[in-house]
């Protein structure tokens, strides 16, 4: 995944840029960078590896030595960026968020026009560099950005820093957000809407799907109007988005309360009577509060996340490291576990590894029962549109492994759709088998129709591909 932030100022933008980028640290833990432009000294750029140290620690020096009236920066979980490019458009810096599924095909086309690339350490091309090369195929930034949006299969949002202003372009189907902020001496563009609030900016507006704007210290100009079709990622509300953020006017925190509330309504007729409701911190917390408020069952924190040093556990490259982080960052409160029946809400079940270990950890700490309520439907399809996971195969999903076991072979699309239907016999068999394998006392997933209701916008505007396979 990843996130970005850009700012302009009549004075120096680096303070705002530094903290605006830092507020995206929940979206990645591998690379981070900042690029600035000053009318007197030109461009400056810094990129650091943040796998073993947070953004603020790595960029403290740059926050004091870099200067500029405009700048962009990013947290990236894949490639090093922003990159600095010199072309017929002049010198510019670019940062992107998205996923390019047809990179090899595009690469051949671009190379045929005499472009060349530097390989990354793993032998692959930097996707942001590829986007820059696509843009350079056209006569100006507007045509270049539109060309990139047109030919990229997957998703693509970007910020481009030039001497005249910052271009902000949202993905053509709005799969990821870009929101603008305004204060007296400039503007900003941000992936997360909360990232600029403590910096003195006020909400200005969100970009629509495919919309392109350019802004400087004085104004924001629309260059390409937004399209009518949107497919924003629903998983942003479920997990990735920070609780204080909002997308399309819908609060992440409130949406998670709604999820918990609707989960509790589905449980009312079941013979499940836990002593307390808890959430797997941090993303499961709001879901659990919503459940507790609706059900009347007390909310508790049977384990506490040690936040000062442990990052999100999906980020490290190796599964063993992810599992270690998942274990080490949660500290038990035995008085709230021993002899208790617990209902635990997590944002999702992907591989099943971490939640199974959490469940065993609770049993080992004296829990009588552990009822699991994921806050989204079963994940049946790998995401085609965003770099949400390091998974290289859909068979890493626990659902797909269980379905193959039940079917005796790899299922076709129509069979998977049967398993996606929460009212089908196949769906219930899959859920029962997952419950058995994971040693849960009971398991009930959030239904897709309830999830869509939890968000509260037009269902046609939501991407739900990872749950139902519908593009």
At which residue positions do the language-model features occur?
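Short, glycine/charge-rich flexible loops or terminal/linker lids adjacent to PRPP-binding catalytic cores
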Residues: 296-341, 380-392
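Phosphate/diphosphate-binding loops
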Residues: 195, 202, 207-211, 260, ...
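Flexible loop/turn segments at secondary-structure boundaries
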Residues: 12-14, 102, 167, 175-176, ...
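A conserved beta-strand->alpha-helix junction
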Residues: 121-129, 134, 299-312, 405-413, ...
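Secondary-structure transition/capping motifs at alpha-helix termini
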Residues: 268-274, 293-300, 334-338, 360-369
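PRPP-dependent phosphoribosyltransferase catalytic core
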Residues: 164-165, 200-206, 359-471
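Conserved short alpha-helical segments that host acidic/polar catalytic motifs at enzyme active sites
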Residues: 1-208, 214-275, 280, 369
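Long, K/E/R/D-enriched contiguous segments that form extended
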Residues: 274-311
């Amino acid at each position: 995944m990843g996130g970005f932030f850009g700012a302009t100022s009549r004075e120096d933008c680096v303070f705002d840029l530094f903290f605006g980028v830092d507020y995206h640290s929940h979206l990645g833990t591998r690379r981070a960078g900042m690029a600035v432009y000053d009318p007197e000294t030109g461009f400056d750029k810094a990129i650091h590896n943040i796998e073993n140290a947070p953004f603020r620690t790595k960029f403290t020096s740059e926050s004091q030595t870099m200067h500029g009236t405009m700048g962009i920066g990013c947290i990236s979980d894949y490639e090093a960026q922003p990159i600095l490019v010199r072309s017929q458009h002049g010198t510019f810096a670019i940062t992107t968020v998205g996923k390019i599924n047809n990179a090899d095909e595009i690469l051949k086309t671009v190379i045929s026009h005499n472009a060349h690339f530097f390989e990354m350490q793993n032998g692959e091309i930097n996707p942001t560099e590829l986007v820059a090369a696509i843009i350079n195929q056209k006569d100006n930034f507007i045509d270049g950005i539109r060309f990139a949006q047109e030919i990229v299969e997957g998703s693509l949002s970007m910020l481009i820093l030039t001497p005249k202003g910052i271009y902000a372009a949202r993905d053509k189907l709005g799969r990821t957000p870009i929101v603008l902020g305004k204060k007296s001496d400039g503007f900003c563009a941000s992936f997360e809407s909360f990232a600029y609030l403590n910096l003195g900016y006020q909400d200005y507006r969100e970009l629509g799907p495919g919309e392109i704007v350019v802004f400087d210290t004085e104004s924001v100009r629309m260059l390409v109007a937004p399209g009518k079709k949107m497919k924003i990622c629903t998983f942003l509300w479920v997990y990735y988005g920070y609780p204080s953020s909002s997308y399309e006017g819908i609060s992440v925190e409130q949406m998670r309360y709604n999820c918990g509330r609707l989960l509790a309504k589905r449980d009312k007729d079941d013979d499940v009577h836990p002593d307390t409701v808890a959430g797997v911190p941090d993303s499961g917390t709001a879901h659990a509060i919503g459940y507790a408020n609706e059900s009347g069952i007390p909310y508790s924190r049977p384990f506490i996340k040690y936040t000062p040093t442990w990052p999100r556990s999906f980020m490290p490259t190796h599964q063993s490291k992810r599992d270690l982080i998942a274990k080490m960052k949660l500290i038990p409160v035995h008085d709230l576990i021993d002899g208790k029946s617990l209902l635990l809400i997590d944002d999702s079940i992907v591989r099943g590894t971490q939640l199974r270990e959490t469940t065993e950890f609770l049993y080992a700490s004296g829990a009588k029962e552990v009822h699991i309520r994921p806050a989204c439907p079963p994940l049946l399809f790998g995401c085609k549109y965003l770099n949400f996971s390091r998974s290289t195969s859909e068979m890493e999903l626990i659902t797909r492994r269980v379905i193959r076991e039940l079917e005796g072979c790899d299922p076709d699309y129509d069979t998977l759709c049967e398993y996606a239907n929460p009212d089908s016999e196949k769906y219930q068999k899959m859920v029962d088998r997952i419950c058995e394998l994971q040693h849960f006392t009971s398991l009930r997933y959030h239904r897709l129709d309830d999830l869509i209701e939890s968000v509260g916008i037009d269902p046609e505007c939501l991407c739900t591909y990872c749950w139902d396979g519908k593009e």
